[in-house]
């Protein structure tokens, strides 16, 4: 029957064969009689029914059950079946519809069903949510709030409503608050209502939520996250936060949260959990028993609810206005999962109430790492709910902040918190994600809390901040947040930049240091600073919390803090100056460092808010969130108003204010400027900073973090795509996170935690963990993501160079430098954040959330992942590379890698970002001069030349990287954003000339990860058909014109590289494999260079691209001696003429071939001569290996090269 149905179904239905008869008759009362008749005939018994009835009705009655089954199969066939009537009858199983209707009714009205349906409906059906949700929530009905609240919270769609919070307010404070709730109300008297609503709601919600989630698990885990949302819930965070989040997050997160394993927070949540659970039971069930109970089971549905419901839910309860705003914003927010953030939103209200509260909780929680953690989560927004949907949530957090913002407007604090929470949320997400992280944070939190409590803990301060924020956020933030949402990211970046600038200018250095320390925990490094920062952060509201999350990573926090403190002590002063003064050349090193400092600062300028180290992260989020939330004004308002106020508390800490101004200013700066401003704000140095910092952070993390970077980046990318707008912001945030992380990289663990928090939050928790793994890398990940793969790569690449080279250069700042590298990296992330994704074809900046953006982000992620591999190689490499970094520092990352590690060297594949980074690295290492030129040349136009010289002088590879970097950087990393900075045709052309290889051949499909590179690559392929020769020229130029400078570096590097190349040749396969994975990553990101270079240079293991930066890198490495190289090229060319030609052909560019040839040639050089051949054979083999890894390489080059080589 079914077979008939299915196969014959269409005909059966058409002809009314038995196929549909029983079902039709039974389920579909209105099957056409003819159909039924036919069906009846065929069906026999059923047929009988059908016939008997003639209509299907009889059958329906008789064969309800059967009919139902049939109905489903039939629905499909019916759907296929054209007749609408029949289809309707058949397809629409009346019974099924009935059931759904019942469900809908029950869902909406019923308890269990409602819960299931309700949540689901709420979630899926916005309809329910508004109608049922708002109303159903009992939000209206249970104005009391307690009853409605919990259920609603639990219900999330319905429960999200603050109503539950209010009811829960009373209870939540005790349970959730644990310590904070009261303060929240107290602290946020004005917001108290919201706070109460939020906070208490948090608690109630957690209870409500908890039951739904896994009441316990969810509450615990999600609640922590959720609590994060609830500032008040800081302590109670879980509970309140959970509640807050639970409404939104819980819905989705119930299961997810449970899964997320907020369990770590569970303990924290535990107490709340009980109350929450109890409450939930009584409250939830009472207000919406169906919702509450179903909630638990209905955890999945809540997910959708989370999106729309959460905002609504909270909106109603907490501040009608705020919650509503949240709801509106939240609900509107595209990312429902993100809208776990709704909880963030909720948190915002909470925050609004508790903007300071969270901070306060922090103070209170100081002793309570968990609380603090909780709080961070609360603030961070366990908003972390994003943990489960980390990415989505992160995005939502941003939006939620916006939503929150509107609502927060009234309770500015909320917004403030909200924005930060958003950030925090992201971070928290991370936190949540890494529930552990939060814990690590605790120490930080404690420290921070202890220190931080000072200022913002003051209810008075809170109130003031709130008022201010209210004023700012009210108008600006609401608007900006919404409007700026998208801009937000940029703004965030800008803010950051500005922060950076401001920070830089202001206490930038010290705060920066604190920030750096902050990674440990602001207060860690400079307790005072930290504290103020924390306070500032507190002021920032979320940022501190966020930062806590980030601080969480402060596992090493204390340790790092000490370190950082020491470092920062000297570095702060030193760095502060370099940051400001060193900008140019020095900043390269120092600038880098400075920028590191600046980055610290700058990085932290980015996080000006971030400045308070925690704020750093938080600011980042804050900034980001703020920007996002308070896009332009928001940023200002958020940072300025919120932070301003908070900063006020922090005023002591210029940083926060700095952040505020910085944020504000940066906000103004264009996103591009963000990159630039980041740099620019940093000062001229910032530029450097951006590149340098990007480089530096990249560098540092690069070593460690690069791999992580990749994951992080992936996460970020994910986030970016998911967040789209948030992406920008997230990116920025991530960048910040990255920056923070970068800062933290010092505390790699910390950074990891932090990054996890920051990035993790932004990234999926998983990523955060990844990040966690490589604290530093995580940031890089972000940055790479943000920046582009380039960044990731750049990070990796730059890290060694910068960290090693630069750090060494800046002897005293070396440590700092590294620290700063992280900050720099941080900046870079900002930069990346700043760096918008650019359409590979159009070159247009892609909207964060757009599909293209997602694709690009994915590509970046992939590249980064590869880069991650590469980065990892690099990471490991970095040690050696770093050591080598000094030597090859100018040379190029790739060289470093090659020199230090042939395998790693691949990592170098400079993505545009990498190029940037390299550029930065190179530029920085090269010296201020280059750096400056880079700045000057930053402009694409000039840069190429500059770069050209640079490349040659400094190192083609880095230049390749850097070139795009400067161009990108100044340009706001537009190019880098493009992933293949080179992708830009103009850019590429310039690059071509400078480093033809890398752009010449579009990456094979495998490389296609770099969307841009392929297009540009292909373009360039044709274009580079001749350019490749240019590449040769380029190389030749490097050899001939700038052999000494470039090659000198290369020589130093090259010689090692020679060894490296040989090594590469020898271990070509390993390298290739690595490169395939990593290199490919590079190829994708650095496709122009890596892909083209590698593809073209594949024969050479795609190590050094003859013409491309990569070639330069590898080639340069290979061509230790310019003359020798040249000669080698010639000989190799002769020997490999066919190969080259072939290569060219396969490469798609004579130049490419040349390059490839060159590349191959490189191996052919002197000692490589044999290698050249061998390399050719081997590289080809390697390529073969590569092909195994990636066919493109193998098919593209192996055959040709091998043949030619052979």
Curated annotation (Swiss-Prot):
PANTHER family: SIMILAR TO AI661453 PROTEIN. The keyword Phosphoprotein applies. Keywords: Methylation, Phosphoprotein. The modification Phosphothreonine is found at residue 680. The modification Omega-N-methylarginine is found at residues 1051, 1083, 1094. Residues 133-547, 568-837, 859-1206 are annotated as: Disordered. Residues 1028-1041, 1170-1184 have a biased composition (Polar residues). This is Uncharacterized protein C6orf132 homolog. Residues 139-151, 159-234, 384-413, 1001-1016 have a biased composition (Pro residues). The keyword Phosphoprotein applies. Residues 351-363, 454-467, 568-577, 732-747 have a biased composition (Basic and acidic residues). The modification Phosphoserine is found at residue 255. Signal peptide: none annotated. Residues 305-319, 414-436, 522-531, 656-671 have a biased composition (Low complexity). It comes from Mus musculus.
